[in-house]
């Protein structure tokens, strides 16, 4: 299987590469594609070292040529950030002037990101369709995932969007219940960030009432939503629902704090310095602060099932 990653120069890419390496011989070729040549070379070389650490027989290459990179691909992952972190910081700040939440996937900021991103993703997808293998899948990681993936589907692309909210809940619930995550089956209502967990089945038995009874403060704290809201709902909302349930509080907090984009930009600069170390061959702990917990696990499971 050839996997092409569009936006492969992201500092997050090594998280994906680590997951792809664990797919074993299923992945024969991994191509990272990005217009930022210097950054791509750093991430690409580090990705090669990750594959070697696992003893993976597949090749890892990189290119700034989108058309060449996606040619013959079985799966194309799209993880773009049009405008980079500078645009993200704008998305997280301009809504505050209107008394609205500033966030890259929700509200006015999310809509602005979608308007910038969808045309670019559709162009990329058209080029993938023209050059990838017949029947190739597009896997979208690009936020806002719901809007971007819907645009891909409406344009007739064979695409699926991936979000880490569900797998994050699965892992958290499994830890609290002290069971293997694979045994937890969620009743996951909603799409992408606008979601609620209505049940958590283990061996056919819904254990969510038990979780709410025994771990309500912990669950509420994890999603930053008042415990009384969870108790009233009888389910666990995505932490993104905090922007709706606690809108005014979030706006006040955002006005007094650095944006998430500013923090991510700082983390990215440090990560790139770390990736340049030729002795580094495993993802650093700092990558966990970049965001996207469990994305590689979700991606591995999804791509293996395609």
Which residues does each predicted region cover?
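Short glycine-/small-residue-rich Rossmann-like dinucleotide-binding loops
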Residues: 74, 81-82, 143
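Rossmann-fold NAD(P)-binding glycine/threonine-rich loop
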Residues: 86-154
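Rossmann-fold dinucleotide-binding core
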Residues: 14, 137-204
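NAD(P)-binding Rossmann-fold cofactor-contacting core
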Residues: 26-50
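Conserved glycine-rich cofactor-binding loop
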Residues: 9
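Long, compositionally biased stretches enriched for glycine and/or charged residues
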Residues: 175-306
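Short acidic low-complexity segments
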Residues: 59-72
């Amino acid at each position: 299987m050839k996997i092409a990653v569009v936006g492969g120069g992201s500092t997050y890419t090594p998280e994906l590469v680590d997951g792809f390496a664990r797919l074993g011989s299923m992945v024969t070729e991994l191509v990272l594609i990005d217009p930022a040549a210097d950054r791509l070379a750093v991430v690409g070389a580090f990705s090669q070292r990750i594959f070697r650490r696992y003893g993976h027989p597949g090749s890892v290459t990189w290119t700034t040529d989108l058309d060449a990179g996606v040619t013959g691909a079985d799966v194309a992952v799209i993880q773009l950030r049009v405008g980079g972190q500078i645009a993200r910081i704008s998305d997280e700040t301009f809504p505050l002037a209107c008394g609205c939440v500033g966030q890259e996937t929700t509200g006015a900021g999310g809509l602005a990101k979608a308007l910038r991103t969808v045309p670019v993703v559709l162009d990329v997808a058209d080029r993938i369709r023209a050059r990838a293998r017949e029947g190739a899948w597009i896997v979208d990681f690009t936020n806002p995932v719901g809007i971007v993936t819907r645009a891909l589907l409406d344009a007739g692309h064979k695409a699926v969007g991936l979000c880490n909210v569900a797998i994050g809940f699965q892992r958290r619930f499994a830890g609290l219940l002290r069971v293997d995550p694979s045994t937890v089956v969620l009743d996951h209502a909603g799409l992408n960030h606008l979601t609620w967990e209505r049940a958590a089945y283990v061996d056919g038995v819904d254990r969510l009432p038990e979780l709410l009874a025994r771990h309500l403060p912990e669950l509420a704290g994890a999603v930053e939503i008042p415990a009384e809201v969870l108790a009233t709902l009888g389910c666990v909302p995505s932490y993104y629902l905090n922007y709706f349930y606690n809108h005014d509080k979030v706006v006040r907090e955002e006005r007094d704090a650095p944006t998430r984009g500013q923090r991510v930009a700082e983390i990215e600069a440090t990560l790139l310095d770390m990736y340049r170390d030729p002795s580094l061959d495993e993802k650093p702990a700092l990558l966990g602060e970049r965001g996207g917990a469990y994305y590689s696990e979700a991606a591995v499971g999804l791509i293996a099932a395609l």
